[in-house]
């Protein structure tokens, strides 16, 4: 049974300030910029692009600075508040809304050039339905870049340890974290009719770039 929606909202509301502080960590900044570049290499501006589970907005803002029309959505009101504040302070034009991404998405059919879903899949109660909704929203030739915590138990990166510690601390709440590997994430994406362009494992996470 997946963890209830209120649980994730509670957790990420409480962690919003800590996630915003991570913005200044060189490792985090480099990862955000590299992720934004990866999508920018296959999606021409202005997109549009949706960042699902956008958190404090780092990826959405990185894409907006590259000339994309970006909408970031997240189930945590405080995370969205942090993202909006950062956009205003940095004078970056991006839209952020509070929305549960496990529900049907509020984007029209074939309306998006690109979708980011960075470290959100592990919390979605129905992963196949989530990917199917993304496919519905992508226009032909649009791209999805999705990442999830890596199942590789030998990894000891800070990110991998973060997710494993979270899973251990919240063990009384089932379904808090799901781990993936290249096979399971590729299969999940392909089963919903998307074509996998690239699948790779990075420290602590697995990522798939797919085309509609």
Sequence positions of predicted segments:
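A short glycine-rich, Lys/Arg-flanked "PGG" loop and its adjoining helix->strand segment in the class I
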Residues: 128-140
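A conserved beta-strand element that flanks and buttresses the S-adenosyl-L-methionine
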Residues: 116
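Class I SAM-dependent methyltransferase SAM/SAH-binding core
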Residues: 50, 56-103
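Conserved class I S-adenosyl-L-methionine
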Residues: 1-44, 62, 145-167, 203
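Acceptor-substrate binding/catalytic loop of class I
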Residues: 167-183
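Short catalytic micro-motifs in class I SAM-dependent methyltransferases
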Residues: 119-123
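Short conserved loop adjoining the S-adenosyl-L-methionine
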Residues: 104-109
């Amino acid at each position: 049974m997946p963890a209830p929606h209120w649980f994730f909202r509670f957790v990420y509301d409480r962690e919003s300030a800590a996630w915003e502080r991570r913005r200044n960590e060189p490792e985090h900044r480099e990862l955000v910029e590299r992720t934004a570049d990866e999508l920018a290499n296959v999606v021409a501006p202005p997109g549009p692009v949706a960042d699902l589970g956008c958190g404090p907005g780092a990826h959405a803002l990185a894409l907006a600075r590259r000339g994309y029309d970006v909408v970031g959505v997240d189930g945590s009101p405080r995370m969205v508040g942090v993202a909006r504040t950062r956009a205003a302070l940095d004078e970056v034009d991006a839209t952020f809304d509070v929305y549960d991404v496990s529900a049907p998405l509020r984007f029209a059919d074939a309306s998006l050039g690109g979708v980011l879903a960075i470290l959100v899949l592990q919390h979605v109660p129905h992963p196949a339905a989530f990917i199917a909704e993304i496919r519905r929203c992508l226009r032909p030739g649009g791209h999805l870049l999705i990442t999830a915590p890596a199942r590789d138990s030998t990894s000891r990166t800070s990110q991998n340890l973060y997710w494993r510690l979270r899973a251990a601390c919240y063990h009384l709440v089932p379904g808090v974290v799901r781990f993936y590997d290249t096979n399971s994430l590729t299969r999940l994406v392909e089963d919903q009719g998307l074509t996998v362009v690239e699948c790779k494992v990075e420290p602590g996470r697995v990522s798939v770039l797919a085309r509609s």
